[in-house]
Structures are given as C-alpha cells and as structure tokens.
C-alpha cells in the first residue's frame, strides 16, 4: 500500500522518536524531506541528518535533547494533500508569538516563516514546529 502523506509520516516519526527518547529516526528519503530536515537543523530542532543508500535512499535524523527533554515540543502538519494551505507574504503566521517556526515551501525553496517574510515571499505552509 502506498503512503498518502509522506511529510505527515516524517513529522510523526520525529514526534514518536522523541517521545521514546530515541537517538535517531530513519525514514524513506525525498527532496522535500531533506529540505525540511535542513530547515530543522538550521533552526536547532535536530542535531544532524544524513542520507544513506543509492537505490532506495534512507534519511536518518539525529534527534536533539536539552537536559533530558526533547527540543521539539510540538510539531504539527498544516497543509495536507486533502487541504492545501497557501499564505501570501503579509499573511504568514507567527508560531507561538515568534518562539516557534512555520516551515514554508516557496518558489525559492523550503524556508522558515522569518526567512520568507524577509525575502518577501508567500507559499504553502508545510508545518509548525515549536
């Protein structure tokens, strides 16, 4: 059976991995997942990520903890296959009054809400991370 929403699966694996205090989680890789992982790493929500395998690439995320607690408090899918959510540059949300981030897919690539606001871009809101 095919996976309907691979991004929601990625976010769920991160959420479950941190709830179980796992060091790392693995999942099938894609360009969008790698772009999201890159944003999460730049913002300090994960330690690192790497791609392994040639024929079927696997993405491995090293999860991050601070004083025994998970760094990612909440991670929530917003735009989904059945209901895409697009926002203009003026309508981009602030997650937890600026403490969290919104991961946004723009015409210039995947970036945070702050970077999109700075670049004057809108796009599809993939998820909220806090």
From Swiss-Prot:
One of its GO terms (cellular component) is ribonucleoprotein complex. Keywords: Ribonucleoprotein, Ribosomal protein, RNA-binding, rRNA-binding. InterPro entries: Ribosomal_uS8, Ribosomal_uS8_CS, Ribosomal_uS8_sf. One of its GO terms (biological process) is translation. One of its GO terms (molecular function) is structural constituent of ribosome. Part of the 30S ribosomal subunit. Contacts proteins S5 and S12. One of the primary rRNA binding proteins, it binds directly to 16S rRNA central domain where it helps coordinate assembly of the platform of the 30S subunit. NCBIfam families: PRK00136.1 (NF001109). Belongs to the universal ribosomal protein uS8 family. This is Small ribosomal subunit protein uS8. The lineage of its organism: Bacteria, Pseudomonadati, Pseudomonadota, Gammaproteobacteria, Enterobacterales.
């Amino acid at each position: 059976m095919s996976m309907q929403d691979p991004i929601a699966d990625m976010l769920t694996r991160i959420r479950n991995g941190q709830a179980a205090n796992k060091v790392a989680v693995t999942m099938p890789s894609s360009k969008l997942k790698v772009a999201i992982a890159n944003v999460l790493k730049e913002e300090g929500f994960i330690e690192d990520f790497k791609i392994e395998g040639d024929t079927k690439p696997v993405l491995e995320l090293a999860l991050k903890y601070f004083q025994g607690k998970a760094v990612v408090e909440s991670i929530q899918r917003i735009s989904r296959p059945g209901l895409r959510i697009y926002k203009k540059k003026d309508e981009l949300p602030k997650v937890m009054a600026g403490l969290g981030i919104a991961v946004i897919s723009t015409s210039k690539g995947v970036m945070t809400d702050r970077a999109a606001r700075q670049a004057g871009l809108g796009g599809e809101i993939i998820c909220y991370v806090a």
